[in-house]
């Protein structure tokens, strides 16, 4: 048989794709920190309470107690602190040197020898107390004469005011008194009328004293008689 068999198409199988891993949700930074904290939480040791005073106080006490003329070295200070306070001196040594440097700059400690934290140190002499002179009471400055004169003038000018008021009040009283006096004056003329009537009696009595003119009349005829005698010559 010459007829060929029909060709059967075979499906081409595709290679399976590699499975991509599923993405894990991104962790927030806050959660990550919490996770770290949860893992690092360990019981903390309580801070040891120091059984000694501050370094500065211990060093000052050492220098005052040793009180060496040439100053105390750092070694001498260390020995004193160990004997007195029973401290771990190697741990405190950096703090001791730091305090000494700062105290020298401030003038709280004198450095007799050496430089920096090496050498010998001592306390400065106590400062002498200077007695402050008591403040003298302030004297009041004398006032100038002009001011005193002005004040006196003011006082003198103020005093006459009540006197003027009194004087002004007196005329009012006089006027009140003068009114009844006028009434009395008006009443007096009535009393003088009888005196006026009595005056004619005195006038009538005056003619009684007229004998003097008679003498003068008697003397005149004698003179007349003498004149004719001259004619006879």
Curated annotation (Swiss-Prot):
Keyword annotations from UniProtKB, A to Z: Chromosome, DNA-binding, Nucleus
Q: Which species is this UniProt entry from? A: Glyptotendipes salinus (Midge)
Molecular function terms in GO for this entry?
DNA binding; structural constituent of chromatin
Per the record, which residues fall in region Disordered?
A: 1-55, 115-233
The entry's localization annotation reads: Nucleus; Chromosome
**Per the record's keyword annotation, is GTP-binding included, yes or no?**
no
Q: Which cysteines are joined by disulfide bonds?
A: none
Q: What is its main location?
A: nucleus
Q: Pull one GO CC term from this UniProt entry.
A: nucleosome
Compositionally skewed regions (Basic and acidic residues) per UniProt: 128-137, 144-155
Its protein name is Histone H1-I
Its GO biological process annotations read: nucleosome assembly
């Amino acid at each position: 048989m010459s007829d060929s068999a029909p060709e059967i198409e075979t499906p081409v199988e595709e290679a399976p794709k590699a499975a991509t891993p599923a993405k894990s949700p991104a962790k927030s930074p806050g959660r990550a920190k919490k996770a770290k904290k949860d893992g690092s939480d360990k019981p903390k040791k309580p801070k040891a309470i120091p059984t000694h005073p501050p370094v500065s106080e211990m060093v000052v006490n050492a220098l005052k107690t040793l009180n060496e003329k040439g100053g105390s070295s750092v070694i001498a200070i260390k020995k004193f602190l160990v004997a007195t306070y029973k401290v771990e001196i190697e741990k405190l040594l950096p703090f001791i040197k730091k305090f000494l440097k700062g105290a020298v700059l401030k003038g709280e400690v004198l450095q007799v020898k050496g430089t920096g934290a090496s050498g010998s140190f001592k306390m400065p002499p106590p400062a002498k107390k200077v007695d402050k002179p008591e403040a003298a009471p302030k004297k009041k400055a004398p006032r100038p004469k002009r001011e005193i004169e002005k004040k006196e003038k003011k006082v003198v000018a103020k005093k006459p005011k009540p006197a003027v008021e009194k004087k002004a009040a007196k005329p009012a009283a006089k006027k009140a008194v003068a009114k009844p006096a006028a009434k009395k004056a008006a009443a007096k003329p009535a009393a003088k009328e009888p005196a006026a009537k009595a005056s004619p009696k005195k006038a009538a009595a005056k003619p009684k004293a007229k004998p003097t003119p008679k003498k003068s009349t008697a003397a005149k005829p004698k003179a007349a008689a003498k004149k004719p005698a001259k004619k006879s010559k």
